[in-house]
């Protein structure tokens, strides 16, 4: 059994913490603040799809892997706030991260919040020591920034970054949080 961490690539698009949608990229490009859940300190591990594929391939045909369970992860982890800061560096523009409690986002009925509620609002850190021991050839080569760059290039080329001006939920929630004091 191989359990990859959050695997991303050009086909999936560039994730964000609070919702399964991509308008946040356009918001950053326009210089508009973006929401994060809480203070953005929840830890997460990301694995670029090409590295994940190599992990699966290197397990094939290995007697010591039969019947085992492996976490297919990078050794490194990152907070969601730093994930978004890395994305901003790749995009070439820095904006304010505005924290909102998960409960406030649920009350506001933020669309596509399920991934945040079930996974991304929480620390998700898994050990890759077992796969490193049994499959030493597996070591992720693509940095988060390089992977993000490849994903953004594909999304731009395919026109998959939506216009953020048509969505109002994020601006409304940011205004509310700024009024009460964001994280």
What spans do the regions from the language model cover?
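NAD(P)-dependent short-chain dehydrogenase/reductase
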Residues: 1, 5-43, 87-89
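Mid/C-terminal beta-alpha module of Rossmann-like enzyme folds, strongest
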Residues: 58-116, 128, 150, 178-181
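Residue-level signal for the nucleotide or nucleotide-sugar donor/cofactor binding architecture
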Residues: 47, 75-78, 126, 142
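Glycine-rich Rossmann NAD(P)(H)-binding loop
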Residues: 9, 37-42, 70-77, 88-90, ...
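Generic structural signal for alpha-helix termini and adjacent loop/cap motifs
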Residues: 31, 62-63, 134, 154-158
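Substrate-positioning beta->alpha
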Residues: 16-24, 37-60, 67-68, 146
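Amphipathic terminal alpha-helices
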Residues: 142-183
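Conserved C-terminal active-site "lid" loop/helix of NAD(P)H-dependent oxidoreductases
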Residues: 49, 106-138, 157-161
């Amino acid at each position: 059994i191989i359990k990859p961490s959050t695997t991303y690539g050009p086909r999936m698009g560039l994730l964000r913490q609070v919702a399964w949608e991509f308008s946040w990229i356009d918001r950053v490009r326009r210089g508009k603040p973006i929401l994060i859940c809480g203070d953005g300190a929840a830890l997460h591990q990301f694995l670029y799809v090409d590295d994940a594929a190599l992990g699966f391939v290197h397990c094939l045909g290995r007697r010591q892997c039969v019947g085992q369970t492996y976490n297919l992860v990078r050794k490194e982890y990152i907070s969601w706030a730093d994930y978004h800061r890395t994305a901003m560096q790749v995009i070439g523009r820095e904006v304010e991260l505005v924290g909102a409690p998960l409960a406030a986002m649920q009350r506001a009925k933020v669309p596509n919040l399920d991934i945040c509620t079930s996974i991304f609002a929480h620390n998700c850190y898994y050990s890759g020591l077992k796969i490193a021991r049994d499959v030493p050839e597996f070591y992720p080569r693509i940095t988060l920034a390089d992977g993000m760059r490849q994903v953004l290039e594909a999304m731009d080329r395919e026109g998959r970054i939506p216009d953020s001006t048509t969505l109002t939920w994020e601006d409304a929630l940011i205004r509310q949080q700024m009024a009460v004091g964001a994280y």
